[in-house]
């Protein structure tokens, strides 16, 4: 503590280790800080600049790569987690009703607020987040900084719900940006990977509380391919879990509802005994008898879902939005997720099935299930809203809002700007609102479990998975365990590998990154991102984790 500036000691923690939630990487920063207000964050930035330190800002640590690893200063905003302002937006008064309907509420929160904390606040106030990913453990800043998404034909990245953001630059100045005010900063901060500044406040467009009515069906793999063109457009929300060794999938589709709550069917591995038994079987198949893996999947699938195709029947449930959209991610895991155009899905899945089948027959490698298959509508007009006088606005038009009810499908967006580092394919935006598969992005998530926190070999499977996705025009999710490509001659592979191993990584899940293709992938958007980065951080205070950023071509000279 002797080398910590006096002004920072009131909010330095006793914690000495930072690790990912999955336990895949860990580091020992020089100090871990938990500021409680903007002034303390400003002081942290000031002292970092004066002492030549870098700052890594972290939340829940759910990114399983070395993205957040540092040997310098680390900032956690868990104590900076208050709801500050509610701004309700009403429909016009009806001649027969003196109580106007609330269409949405813009909620301003401190950036360290965890999503589960926000969900609890919203529930108490009869509100809800419009679209969620699979978990609610992240902070609101972390949620938007890495490109989190759900699974729906109508919604894009979760950052689509963000109206405005405040952040501190390396001079400690508080900057406000939105689709109307400093839109170039807004597009950078909406997927910043922590390299633009420290987010302090987020204004999120929330909606009246709603429930989710879902139908869960068991279908054969061939049924999925045969119905591919229609499945994605039949409901507001959709998720598919593919279990390759059973040749079956779980198809989950849902819409907003006003029906009374009705619990989903009991979960076998949702019980303590079922969960422990499943993880034990995984441990045995990973470390002792890999060829048992297909039999473990078949057994667990039968216990959890049965073995009969139920297309058209299925299990019905009505849940609150959070319970309906979140899911149980089970155990510590490696996760490799890529996006591609939805229309390439059948070809991708057919090729992946052949790879998995061939590998299991030779014993070369085995995969874990499920492989998650999702979609999002990540298309943008790249323009702000306009009001009745055709002036730029943060709000959709009254005419558009007047046609919406509490159960209307799709979002009331906070913005319609594409983040510079959005790694989904650029697909055509439809101004008339009609959605087709041509506009939808496919997300495929390959998961390998780490039973009881132990490691499993991933490189063979993940490399083939990435080859297939890359060939289909895909790109990786920034926060996941992707491998990447062989680098150019300037890349010091041994030094990079050494750095990853020093952070607790293992040779069989280290990353090569995507520097060779980044400029081809992002072009002028990457240039624009770096222009903003250099303006907001000329001193390099936020270049913590620089090795990861350079490995993936995020930084331009």
Curated annotation (Swiss-Prot):
The keyword Oxidoreductase applies. The modification Pros-8alpha-FAD histidine is found at residue 62. Residues 25-209 form the FAD-binding PCMH-type domain. It is an enzyme of class 1 (oxidoreductase). It catalyses: D-arabinono-1,4-lactone + O2 = dehydro-D-arabinono-1,4-lactone + H2O2 + H(+); L-galactono-1,4-lactone + O2 = L-ascorbate + H2O2 + H(+); L-gulono-1,4-lactone + O2 = L-ascorbate + H2O2 + H(+); L-xylono-1,4-lactone + O2 = dehydro-L-arabinono-1,4-lactone + H2O2 + H(+). D-arabinono-1,4-lactone oxidase that catalyzes the final step of biosynthesis of D-erythroascorbic acid, an important antioxidant and one of the virulence factors enhancing the pathogenicity. Is also able to oxidize L-galactono-1,4-lactone, L-xylono-1,4-lactone and L-gulono-1,4-lactone. Belongs to the oxygen-dependent FAD-linked oxidoreductase family. The gene is ALO1. It comes from Candida albicans (strain SC5314 / ATCC MYA-2876) (Yeast). This is D-arabinono-1,4-lactone oxidase.
């Amino acid at each position: 503590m002797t080398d910590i500036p006096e002004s920072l000691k009131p909010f330095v923690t006793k914690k000495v280790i930072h690790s990912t939630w999955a336990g895949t990487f860990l580091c020992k920063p020089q100090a871990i800080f938990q500021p409680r207000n903007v002034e303390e964050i400003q002081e942290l930035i000031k002292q970092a600049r004066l002492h030549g330190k870098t700052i890594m800002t972290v939340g829940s640590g759910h990114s399983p790569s070395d993205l957040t690893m540092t040997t310098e200063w680390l900032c956690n905003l868990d104590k900076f987690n208050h709801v500050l302002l509610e701004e309700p937006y009403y429909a016009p008064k009806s001649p027969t009703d003196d109580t106007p309907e609330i269409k949405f509420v813009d909620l301003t929160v401190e950036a360290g607020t965890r999503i589960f904390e926000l969900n609890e606040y919203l529930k108490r106030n009869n509100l809800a987040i419009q679209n969620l990913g699979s978990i609610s453990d992240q902070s609101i800043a972390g949620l938007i900084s890495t490109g989190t998404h759900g699974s729906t034909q109508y919604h894009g990245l979760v950052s689509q719900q963000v109206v405005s953001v405040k952040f501190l630059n390396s001079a400690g100045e508080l900057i406000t940006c939105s689709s109307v005010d400093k839109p170039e900063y807004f597009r950078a901060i909406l997927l910043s990977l922590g390299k633009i500044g420290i987010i302090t406040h987020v204004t999120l467009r929330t909606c009246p509380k709603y429930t989710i009515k879902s139908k869960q069906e068991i279908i054969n793999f061939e049924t999925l391919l045969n119905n591919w063109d229609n499945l994605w457009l039949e409901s507001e929300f959709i998720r598919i879990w593919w279990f390759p060794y059973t040749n079956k999938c779980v198809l989950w589709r849902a819409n907003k509802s006003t029906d009374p709550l009705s619990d989903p069917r009991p979960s076998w591995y949702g019980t303590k005994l079922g969960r422990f038994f499943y993880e034990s079987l995984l441990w045995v198949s990973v470390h002792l008898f890999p060829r048992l893996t297909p039999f473990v999947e078949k057994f667990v699938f039968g216990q959890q879902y049965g073995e009969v195709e139920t297309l058209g029947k299925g299990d019905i449930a009505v849940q609150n939005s959070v319970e309906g959209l979140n899911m149980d991610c089970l155990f510590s895991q490696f996760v490799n997720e890529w996006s591609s155009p939805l229309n390439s899905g059948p070809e991708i899945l057919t090729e992946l099935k052949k790879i998995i089948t061939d590998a299991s027959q030779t014993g070369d490698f085995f995969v874990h299930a499920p492989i998650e298959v999702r979609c999002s509508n990540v298309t943008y007009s790249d323009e702000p809203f306009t009001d009745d006088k055709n002036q730029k606005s943060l709000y959709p038009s009254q005419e558009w809002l007047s046609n919406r009810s509490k159960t209307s499908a799709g979002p009331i967006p906070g913005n319609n700007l594409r983040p510079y580092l959005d790694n989904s394919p650029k697909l055509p935006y439809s101004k008339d609102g009609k959605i087709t598969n041509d506009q939808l992005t496919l997300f495929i998530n390959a998961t390998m479990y780490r039973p009881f926190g132990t490691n499993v070999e991933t490189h063979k499977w993940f490399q083939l998975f990435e080859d297939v996705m890359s060939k289909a025009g895909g790109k990786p999710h920034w926060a996941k365990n992707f491998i990447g490509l062989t680098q150019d001659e300037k890349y010091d592979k041994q030094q990079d590998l050494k750095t990853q191993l020093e952070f607790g990584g293992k040779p069989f899940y280290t990353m090569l990154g995507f520097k060779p293709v980044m400029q081809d992938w992002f072009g002028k958007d990457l240039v624009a991102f770096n222009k903003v980065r250099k303006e907001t951080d000329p001193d390099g205070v936020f270049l913590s984790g620089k090795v990861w950023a350079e490995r993936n071509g995020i930084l331009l000279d």
